UniProtKB/Swiss-Prot annotation:
Name by which UniProt lists this protein: Conotoxin Bu1.2
Organism field: Conus bullatus (Bubble cone)
Disordered, as annotated region: 18-43
Modified residues (Glycine amide): 58
Source superkingdom: Eukaryota
Propeptide span(s): 17-42
Signal peptide annotation: 1-16
InterPro entries: Conotoxin_a-typ
Cellular component GO terms held in the UniProt record: extracellular region; host cell postsynaptic membrane
Ranges of biased composition (kind: Acidic residues): 19-31
Disulfide partners: 46-52, 47-57
GO molecular function terms listed in the Swiss-Prot or TrEMBL record: acetylcholine receptor inhibitor activity; toxin activity
Keywords: Amidation, Disulfide bond, Neurotoxin, Postsynaptic neurotoxin, Secreted, Signal, Toxin
Stated family: Belongs to the conotoxin A superfamily.
Length: 59
């Protein structure tokens, strides 16, 4: 029974690592081009500081 448990844990770990490689990279830093496009899509009066975007831009 313990062997089955270890196999399940190993299989889950392998699947987790393989799907992480195929992720869209959402945990990576945005490129300068992405930041510029994001700034262009903001309504007037929005601040570029991520700390105040939610407050002033609703997003």
């Amino acid at each position: 029974m313990f062997t089955v448990f270890l196999l399940v844990v190993l299989a889950t770990t392998v699947v987790s690592f393989s799907t992480d490689d195929e992720s869209d990279g959402s945990n990576e830093e945005p490129s300068a081009d992405q930041a510029a496009r994001s700034a262009m899509n903001r309504p007037p009066g929005c601040c570029n500081n991520p700390a105040c975007v939610k407050h002033r831009c609703g997003g």
